[in-house]
């Protein structure tokens, strides 16, 4: 029999899993997500990506501010769910909620645990230069991403990949992984393995103060920094335009030939010298503008060889 599930998630990363579980016949008893927030130029309240997907499924949507009250617990228990599936919900579940579903709560986490427990595993894996990452289904416990692991999928991280690329691959793989995990849970065959305590690292939330690019660092470190923060919050530098420093987010780049002083533009194609080589910018964004290719940018704003980037 299909399972009766409570789904808990918020961003676009969680949507494929919600839709896949519904498509495979599971009964989505309720969808928990974060409250609508003001966004866009008009700062109108916008529902989360998961809320919008839940409406398409005609599933009940709940946006509690807390799960730590007696009322919230009673409401959660009233769904009489077999299990809860949690994907980037953005709120810590108290033990009483974890204990409520008969078969437990299962989280889809975007790393190869125990590496990169915490809030920003996709960013940190790229920024650290990891050769691979992945997605795991774990049975949740009271710790921070410390639960027993059920299933995993891996992907390679190449120099060309940004957080967007990793996000999209893992969202698709994760949806399939959770469907398989719930199928195994349904038939009583889901096997769990305790996480190793060797190799534990924590993926701290990204701080905007980290975003400025330091071109004195080695080339590959600069590339990883840029791709690990793309598109949000976006690694940035300042280009002198019409005599004024203008902040530019660098969204994509590649390792290029050439040398110069760190931060020096060394050709007419927005190739910038780093500590031991250079990167060539391929996509960027000015404040208030849409992302554009470096070629498009240079057509309207030529940057001469020898200019220093701040």
From Swiss-Prot:
Superkingdom assignment: Bacteria
NCBIfam families: fmt (TIGR00460)
Residue runs in coiled coils: none
UniProt keyword Membrane, yes or no: no
Annotated Gene3D superfamilies: 3.40.50.12230
Name of the protein: Methionyl-tRNA formyltransferase
PROSITE patterns according to UniProt: GART (PS00373)
Keyword check for Ribonucleoprotein: no
Keyword vocabulary terms for this entry: Protein biosynthesis, Transferase
Catalytic activity: L-methionyl-tRNA(fMet) + (6R)-10-formyltetrahydrofolate = N-formyl-L-methionyl-tRNA(fMet) + (6S)-5,6,7,8-tetrahydrofolate + H(+)
UniProt-listed HAMAP family: Formyl_trans
Family: Belongs to the Fmt family.
Pfam families: Formyl_trans_C (PF02911), Formyl_trans_N (PF00551)
Organism of origin: Rhodopseudomonas palustris (strain ATCC BAA-98 / CGA009)
MF terms (GO), sorted A to Z: methionyl-tRNA formyltransferase activity
Enzyme Commission no: 2.1.2.9
Entry function: Attaches a formyl group to the free amino group of methionyl-tRNA(fMet). The formyl group appears to play a dual role in the initiator identity of N-formylmethionyl-tRNA by promoting its recognition by IF2 and preventing the misappropriation of this tRNA by the elongation apparatus.
Binding-site residues, (6S)-5,6,7,8-tetrahydrofolate: 111-114
GO CC annotations, alphabetized: cytosol
């Amino acid at each position: 029999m299909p399972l009766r599930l409570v789904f808990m998630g918020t961003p676009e990363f969680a949507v494929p899993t919600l839709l896949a579980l519904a498509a495979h016949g599971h009964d989505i008893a309720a969808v928990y997500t974060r409250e609508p927030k003001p966004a866009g130029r008009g700062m109108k309240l916008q529902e989360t990506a998961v809320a919008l997907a839940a409406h398409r499924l005609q599933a009940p949507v709940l946006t509690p501010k807390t799960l730590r009250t007696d009322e919230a617990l009673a409401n959660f228990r009233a769904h009489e769910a077999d299990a809860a599936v949690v994907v980037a919900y953005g709120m810590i579940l108290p033990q009483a909620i974890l204990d409520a579903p008969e078969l437990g709560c299962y989280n889809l986490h975007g790393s190869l645990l125990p590496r990169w427990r915490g809030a920003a595993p996709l960013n940190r894996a790229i920024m650290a230069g990891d050769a691979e990452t992945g997605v795991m289904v774990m049975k949740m416990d009271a710790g921070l991403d410390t639960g027993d692991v059920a299933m995993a999928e891996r992907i390679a991280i190449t120099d060309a990949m940004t957080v967007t690329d990793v996000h999209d691959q893992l969202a698709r793989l994760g949806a399939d992984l959770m469907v398989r995990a719930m199928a195994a849970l349904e038939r009583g065959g889901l096997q769990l393995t305790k996480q190793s305590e060797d190799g534990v690292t924590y993926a701290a939330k990204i701080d905007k103060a980290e975003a400025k690019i330091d071109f004195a660092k080695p080339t590959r470190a600069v590339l990883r920094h840029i791709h690990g923060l793309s598109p949000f919050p976006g690694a940035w530098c300042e280009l002198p335009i019409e005599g004024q420093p203008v902040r530019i987010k660098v969204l994509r780049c590649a390792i290029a030939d050439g040398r110069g002083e760190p931060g020096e533009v060394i050709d007419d194609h927005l190739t910038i010298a780093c500590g031991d080589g250079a990167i060539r910018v391929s996509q960027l964004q000015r404040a208030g503008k849409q992302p554009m290719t470096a070629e498009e940018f240079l057509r309207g704003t030529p940057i001469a060889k020898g200019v220093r980037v701040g």
